[in-house]
Amino acid sequence: MVRSGKNGDLHLKQIAYYKRTGEYHPTTLPSERSGIRRAAKKFVFKEKKLFYVGKDRKQNRLVVVSEEEKKKVLRECHENGPGVHHGISRTLTLVESGYYWTSVTNDVKQWVYACQHCQVAKNTVIVAPQQHLPMVGNPWSVVTVDLMGPFHTSNRSHVYAIIMTDLFTKWVMILPLCDVSASEISKAIINIFFLYGPPQKIIMDQRDEFIEQINVELYRLFGAKEIVISRASGSVNPAENTPSTIKTFLSKHCADHPNSWDEHLPALSFAFNVTHLEPNKNTPYFQMFNRNPCVLECPPEEGSEGTSVFARIVAAIREADGVVENKTPASSQMENNNSDELSKSKVVKKKAKQLNPFHLKVGHEVLRQRKNWWKDGRFQSEWVGPCVIDYITESGCAVLRDNTGTRLKRPIKMSHLRPYVRESSEQDSLYLLQGSIVADHDYIGLPEIPVGTYQANILVEDATIGIADNELLISSKDHELLEYRNSKISALVEDHSSLEKQTFSLLDSSNQVLEYLS
């Protein structure tokens, strides 16, 4: 460790001189000799060169002293390869792996900060070109492509399906695919081009490398260049994607017809296009061609199986779409309210905290709860005392005094207190009330002791305290003493009007007084 203000190179020279000669360098101060001896244990000479081995003696770092050698090391570790400049962390790791000097960390930071190449590269921000999506104002201008599958392999070896949706008209085309390679998808897109022509842009939710392969195939087959773009640019509202009704119905159709699901895809596409999938809007067919198709509806003949396959498909699509439309805002609002009420009913009501269950007041004797050992996954507690309530804070905590009159440091919650009930076997229980402090000579000077099972009586509201009969005292002196005691007890009874049982026995106390006077 180099002291503050000392040259690090001089420190290494002093260590090298001490390791080589066994004596201290002339510049070494007497106060530095012990530090030189301790530091020298971390260095060794190998082939007339000083190496740092560390405390574990497992390192092997060459000690560099001169400024020229430091610059050479920094240049080699920072510029690792043609045009490659490491940052501070990587450069420092490379330097510390083979070299040592005292200020290596600061030197690496200053070297990287002063590197012109790093500063220019840091301030250069490469912004990806933003793709401007043309405004969707005409049919078949912007089309989205979604892939679904894998489904059960059909008789024609088809496993996947491609869905092309026009964002303006919601016109849908569904084609089967054998796989999801770039060439297979490009061929399906080209077949749609031959029917309706190429759109301005095609949006796909795929990675950029895969989209680039599709663009290459489309340029090779059709001559369309960079027509497919990624949906990750955020230029398309997710609500404008393929309607969920189409995907849900297609999944159900493929599951119901595992071997022939690809045979009915043209019928499914046409059925979707002539159905009102969006309320208050024309069908996709009308928006695409500005007219409605001529649909021939012939009544089924007697003895026939019923309506045609296409009619059943249209009916199933309308039924599936009607389930979605019937979910009105009022019903959805009602469901939300029901869910809110259900969630509220599931909330477990916490039991209200009993801040002062025993109605304790200033001057009452209490026991306090102390948690002092860990057992069975929780702290175990015991009741210690007695203590006297000195005063009660605004937050409802009690400040206590122990049996020696010393005030405890921390306020105690009222829920951590319980009344102290004196046993008949104890000594004289005559209380001398002094302001808000109760002094009892029975336990003055005694330490706080844990109270066990003998604490049997618990005080509750509406406590009644019996008063000893005055006939037990014969002399006038005894009578005066009893009146004094009863006057003090009556004040205590007013404070304990909510307690149920007797806090101390007056009868035993009077008997003890008689024995004392006799």
From Swiss-Prot:
**This protein's UniProt keywords:** Phosphoprotein
Extract the SUPFAM superfamilies matched here.
Answer: Ribonuclease H-like
Query: What Pfam family is a match for this entry?
Result: Integrase_H2C2
GO biological process terms on file: DNA integration
One example of the protein's molecular function in GO is:
nucleic acid binding
Q: Where is the Integrase catalytic domain?
A: 130-292
Task: Name the Gene3D superfamilies for this protein.
Answer: 1.10.340.70, Ribonuclease H-like superfamily/Ribonuclease H
Highest taxon listed in the record's lineage: Eukaryota
- Residue numbers carrying Phosphoserine: 498
The region annotated as signal peptide is: none
Protein name stated in the entry: Gypsy retrotransposon integrase-like protein 1
Give the source species.
Mus musculus (Mouse)
Q: What is the lineage of its organism?
A: Eukaryota, Metazoa, Chordata, Craniata, Vertebrata
